[in-house]
Structures are given as structure tokens and as C-alpha cells.
Amino acid sequence: VRELGGPLHYQRSWSRLFNTFSRIIHPRRIFVNPAFKELSSFMQALPVFFKNEGTTIYKGRNELKLFERGGRELIVKSYQVPHLINRIAYNSFRASKARRSYRYAEMLRQIGVGTPKPVGFYSTGTWLLFGSSYFVSLKSECPYTYRDFATHTFEHQEEILRAIARTTATLHEHGILHKDYSAGN
């Protein structure tokens, strides 16, 4: 095999420097739960997959999409890009919402609160400003949202509501306040 020569050779010799500079200007943080190593390539290209694939299940301030990878159903939440002050804070001082969602899911599972298993998170930015972020988890087995309880009657509804109350009590016993019983959750 012949080595590259000519103009392409000179461009290749700069690629390491270019990539280093690009990572400084456009940082990204990707974390994959070790239990889901096989999803690393999906996580590496998450913004592209999110833009072009998946089934949208909710679109508002944030967007949720359903993906199937490796026989697993995944939920990917894309968070709205924050306003300027928070873009600076998330880039420099505070963990992104995606990273906090991952951490909170791990904490809840440790205290025995059922929550979908977290797969990972992905965050991007540009130099001093935070950009977009994504949180990935397995799909929840629970088919209901709080809105469903307000608008419909279900079989075993009282049992489900009591389970929600027990979960809330468990959270309080561990010093955790839920703070978001909004209808879409």
C-alpha cells in the first residue's frame, strides 16, 4: 500500500492539532454506564441519531424520543438549550441537567426506588458556553403519567396511587424532595 502523498498528506499531518483545537472550542462530555458498553457507538453519535431517527413521544420545552438498540427500548431526553447565564454556569460551575438526571437515577435505584435504569448522558458546548444535553435511560415499564390519573379512571388506580405515596414517603425518609409531580411525569 502506498503512503499518502501530495496535498492530502499535508492535511493529515495537521489533523491531530486540528482535533485538539476543535475539542477545546467545542467540548463534549459523554458518559456510558459500564453495564451498557455495547451502546457506546450510539452514545458517541447521539445528537445525529436524535436529529434523524427515533420516534417522538413528547415535544415541548424538552423532547423525548424512543429508540430501539440491541433489543432494548431506550428513551432519550433532549433538554432545551438554557438561557445565556445558565449556559455559562452549566459549562463552568454546575452539572448539566442530563448529568444530574443520570446521577439522580442512580441515587434512586440505590435506595430502592424503582426508576428506569440510566444508560448515559451526552453534553456539548462551545468554548465558554454550554450547548445541548441528552439523557438516555431504558424505557419505563410504567405506562401512566400523572396526567392520566387526572383525566382517566384505571383498574387498580387506588393501588397505583398508594404506591406513588409510598415512593414519596421513601424519598422523604432519605431526605429527598421530589418537587416535580407535573402532569407529564
Language model features with spans:
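Juxta-kinase regulatory segment immediately upstream of eukaryotic protein kinase catalytic domains
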Residues: R2-G54
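Conserved ATP-binding subdomain of kinase catalytic cores across diverse folds
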Residues: P7, L39-Y146, A163-H174
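AlphaC helix of the protein kinase catalytic domain
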Residues: T145-F154
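Short alpha-helical scaffold element within the canonical Hanks-type protein kinase domain
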Residues: Q157-L161
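Catalytic-loop of the protein kinase fold
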Residues: I176-A183
